[in-house]
Every structure is written in structure tokens, then in C-alpha cells.
Amino acid sequence: MANVVVIGAQWGDEGKGKITDLLSRSADVVVRYQGGVNAGHTIVVDDKVLKLHLIPSGILYRETICLIGSGTVVDPKILLKEIDMLIDNGIDISGLKISSTSHVTMPYHRLLDEAMEADRGSNKIGTTGRGIGPTYADKSQRNGIRIRDLLNEDRLRDVIEIPLKEKNGLLEKIYGIAPLNKDEIIEEYLDYGQRLSKHVVDCTRTIHAAAKNKKNILFEGAQGTLLDLDHGTYPYVTSSNPISGGACIGAGVGPTLIDRVIGVAKAYTTRVGEGPFPTELQGSINDQLCDRGSEFGTTTGRRRRCGWFDGIIGKYAVYVNGLDCLAVTKLDVLDELDEIQVCIAYELDGKEIDYFPTNSDDLKKCKPIFKKLKGWQCSTANCRKLSDLPENAMNYLRFLAELMEVPIAIVSLGANRDQTIVIEDPIHGPKRALLR
């Protein structure tokens, strides 16, 4: 039995959905512990492409409990669309559970998110415009609406009074947007509550019962380490804590319950939205990575910025998450390159540094120092074990493991489930050196 946290080791979009889907085969419970519909993961099953934003990837396994935890923010309209999509694809969603204390993204959150981002002009953060930040802000101000509030009309009427009055004032007087109608919102969201009610549970009790019965629990993070509110490239971050420590807060468990932390990292680096990106590429190689890697956001559809693998942010992710092992994804995207570069240090103000500057202004000034490695220039898409990989691909993986000082447990070579080399199952396997 092992309880495992899966986190993104870069700026999100690392392929966590596929890795979580893979590990969910061995999990009894999968818990999404933070974020909202600003996240997106794509899973390919039997040539079907399923795009999810809120529901954990484990929903594809009939016997698995999939819990949207207390640390998430839920847009019930989008959640119900996901539920309907899964049902239409013949997927049983009886295992879906939603924490009664998850906060709800309301219509005024989305409107404010879009208006505030537009108002920033050239200083925009790159938000998805899905209302995530304003929802978390209301939560912190103790002014939020929770899933449990959608189950009782009197309760909803009471708790919406103050935030709606406040938000309508902002929308109308500052942004020139027509105020929202209270009764219309209440009617709409009570209907959402009624449709979701059979899935609503006490998050902490559900997880505690599973742990007491020695079940395998998988904690699924959204976004990535460098988007963490406290430890990322602030202010170009999300509004929650994707790092492994966020699993304890968002799921309501103690750190001693966590047995292992696996970080997911692409074989190169991407970022969507604004913010510093030391290894960002321009020109033909950037276009090649973007096209071969289908680097367009699941949530926004925006083209992702692409760059070489950054070992400095990788080592930072190892440290702040306490990573036990890595899953390296999209190795196949590098197949056609004759030379691959990896950032091994930065130059900041004329001095070489080997650490991640937590000040975004300093990070913007950092120039990457690269190590050049030979490419393999042949397809890896059909490799199913390490011995199938070209020698230079193996050398590349070994170099990443040595640079980040953490073993590699999984290598992904495409979107399909079977395009994966599992060196060791992070749930069932013992902790030992892999690819080092």
C-alpha cells in the first residue's frame, strides 16, 4: 500500500493527466486537491480523446473513487458538462465524489477575472479568465460560497447576499458591466446543486476511511510547481498551491500519510501566458517543438511557449516538493533533433549561479548556460522498454536524472496509454535507484 502525490515539476501542462491515468489502475482513491477549471488534462483511450478540467483522471476506472477535494474551486456548470461528456462516452461516473466544502466559482467571479485582466493592459498576468483567482480571493476573505450552500435555498440566499452586492458594485461602477440578478443566479445554482447532490461527501472522512482500510490513495495536482502561489514565479502564478505540500491542505490529510511524491516533467519545457522563461526558444526549433508536441492549452487553446529542458527549475521542483522520482513525458517530441540542449546553470549579473532565483525580476535577467547533447534522430514512439530506446535517448534520460539528482520511474513516448515505459510502479515498487 502506498499513497502517492503526482505534481507538475515545471509550469504546468507536463502530461500529469496521462501519468495519473496510468497510476490510477493501482489506486483505490484519486483526489484532486487544488485548482479549478483553469487546469486541463487530455487522456486518449481507445482512440477517444477525453479532455477533463475538474474530474480526476481515475474516473475511467470503474472501481476507483474520484474525489474533488476541499482545496479545489468548482465551476458546477463546467463540471456538469464534463459529467455529461463522460456519460455520453459510456463511462460510469458513480465513483465521482465532491467535497461539500469546495468553494464555488460564481458568474461574477468569471466576469471580474476577465475585466481585471483586461484592465491590466501590458501588465497582464495571463489568467485563463475562468474566475479562479476571484473565487480563491473570496475564500480567503471568508466571503465565498461552498458546494454545501447549493443544496439549500435559504442557505444560498443568505450567503450570496454580501458577495453579490459587493461584486455588482465593482462590475457596474468600475468596469461598466451590468449587475447580475440575484434570483436568476439562485435558481441556476440551486439546479446545479440538485444535480450534483448525490456526489457530495465529507472529503476528510472519505479519505480517512480509505486510509484506515489500507487503500491506495493517489493525490492529483493541477498546474505546476513554478505556478505555485507561494513558491512560483510570482505574480505570474495561479491562486493555489500545486506543490506536494498543497495535497495535505487541499485534501485534509497529514504529511505522514504521504508515502511518495512523483514529479512529472516534459523532456523540454513549456509555459503558457506571461512571465519569465529563461530557456525559451524562438524560430524554427520552437515551432518544431510546438507542432510536434501539439503545444496548445487544453483550457484556453493558447499556443504554449517552448524551450529547452531547464535543470535549474527541475532541481528547484525536486527540493520544494521532496520528489522521490520523475515521470519524463514527450520524449518522442525530440526524436528529429540532431542536437538537444539542457540548461545546467544561469548567468545573473555576470555571475554563474546554480539555483532558482525566487525573485521574478532576477529570473527575467537570467541567461541560461547550456550543455549540448547529441540527438537520436529516429522514432521512439514504439519503444516499450528501456532497451528499445536509442543509445542517445538513454544518455539524455540519464543526464536528466543525474542533473536533477532524482531517479526516473516512467518515460512517456506519446499520448496513448501503451506509449509508456514503466521502469517501476511508484505505487507498488520499492524505493530504489532508477536510471541513475
UniProtKB/Swiss-Prot annotation:
InterPro entries: Adenylosuccin_syn_GTP-bd (IPR018220), Adenylosuccin_syn_Lys_AS (IPR033128), Adenylosuccinate_synth_dom1 (IPR042109), Adenylosuccinate_synth_dom2 (IPR042110), Adenylosuccinate_synth_dom3 (IPR042111), Adenylosuccinate_synthetase (IPR001114), P-loop_NTPase (IPR027417). Binds 1 Mg(2+) ion per subunit. It is found in: Cytoplasm. Keywords: Cytoplasm, GTP-binding, Ligase, Magnesium, Metal-binding, Nucleotide-binding, Purine biosynthesis. It is an enzyme of class 6 (ligase). GO terms for biological process: 'de novo' AMP biosynthetic process; IMP metabolic process. Substrate binds at T298, T299, T300, G301, R302, R303, R304. The keyword Transferase does not apply. It comes from the Bacteria. It catalyses: IMP + L-aspartate + GTP = N(6)-(1,2-dicarboxyethyl)-AMP + GDP + phosphate + 2 H(+). IMP binds at D13, E14, G15, K16, N38, A39, G40, H41, T128, R142, Q223, T238, R302. SMART domains: Adenylsucc_synt. Its cofactor is Mg(2+). GTP binds at residues 12-18, 40-42, 304, 330-332, 412-414. Pathway: Purine metabolism; AMP biosynthesis via de novo pathway; AMP from IMP: step 1/2. Its EC number is 6.3.4.4. One of its GO terms (molecular function) is GTP binding. Belongs to the adenylosuccinate synthetase family. Homodimer. PANTHER family: ADENYLOSUCCINATE SYNTHETASE (PTHR11846:SF0). This is Adenylosuccinate synthetase. It comes from Prochlorococcus marinus subsp. pastoris (strain CCMP1986 / NIES-2087 / MED4).
